[in-house]
């Protein structure tokens, strides 16, 4: 029996494009395909594209991240929070890492753009980002490492590669995607009005064009779905054994779930609401459902949207069963 043809776009229409933001239109789509495709692409865009970030720093005269620096207004913890926001664009192909040292003196403000003079392989995109304020008499000497990665990597994981004395590993947010929005609208094909049109808006940090980001996300999905379509499904019988030992992926997830929310880029309002409700770690958060969160005092839809985007970046979701990671056994 012949397979009926699906209604699908002949091409993707790109509108209102720039180096960092673009809108895309897919039409027509079969009923239900708008949200299926839109949600899959959004999650991949937010969690799975490669980017560049600072992974570790070493500040002269500083032994740990809780120290203060003479003549510098911000403490080391706040400096680290600012450094996590610095966005980089690769300017030398295949140069995926770089280590450099910067000396700030005779200046009252240290901005992200000051790093450019010390870099050979990368360019800072958000040059006006303030890292810290200094007295004019103060001198700040800092070594920093830039690496290539995907998604979010905790300071604990980075510490394995940066374990030199006085080196401070920091959380790295590699994703080059700032935001992804999509909407599904009804679309008419001849006399049928129940087809769909998918509208997507992709905003990047400028290190990758939105059209290239969308193309990469689609290729990632295709590479995974092709396993089901190319006769690569094998039946394997595995004996399930209850054990406290974890494989590498489980250890990574276990470490991620134990991460403190205070170390992530959450708004003060959302963080205060969660802390007041006893939600302190990512494990605590993903154990809850959206309805559970909305019952928390002073917690609103804006905070829920913020958390949705955070979890998508980390490839997590609400209502997860985390019992297999045995977080209570340490």
Swiss-Prot record:
Region Alpha C-terminal domain (alpha-CTD), annotated ranges: 248-330
Enzyme Commission numbers on file: 2.7.7.6
Keyword field contains Transferase: yes
Catalyzed chemical reaction(s): RNA(n) + a ribonucleoside 5'-triphosphate = RNA(n+1) + diphosphate
Keyword Nucleus annotated: no
Top EC class for this record: transferase
GO BP annotations listed: DNA-templated transcription
Taxonomic superkingdom: Bacteria
Region (Alpha N-terminal domain (alpha-NTD)): 1-232
Keywords: DNA-directed RNA polymerase, Nucleotidyltransferase, Transcription, Transferase
InterPro entries in alphabetical order: DNA-dir_RNA_pol_insert, DNA-dir_RNA_pol_RpoA/D/Rpb3, DNA-dir_RpoA, RBP11-like, RNAP_asu_C, RNApol_insert_sf
Self-association and partners: Homodimer. The RNAP catalytic core consists of 2 alpha, 1 beta, 1 beta' and 1 omega subunit. When a sigma factor is associated with the core the holoenzyme is formed, which can initiate transcription.
Function summary: DNA-dependent RNA polymerase catalyzes the transcription of DNA into RNA using the four ribonucleoside triphosphates as substrates.
Free-text note on domains in this protein's UniProt record: The N-terminal domain is essential for RNAP assembly and basal transcription, whereas the C-terminal domain is involved in interaction with transcriptional regulators and with upstream promoter elements.
Protein name: DNA-directed RNA polymerase subunit alpha
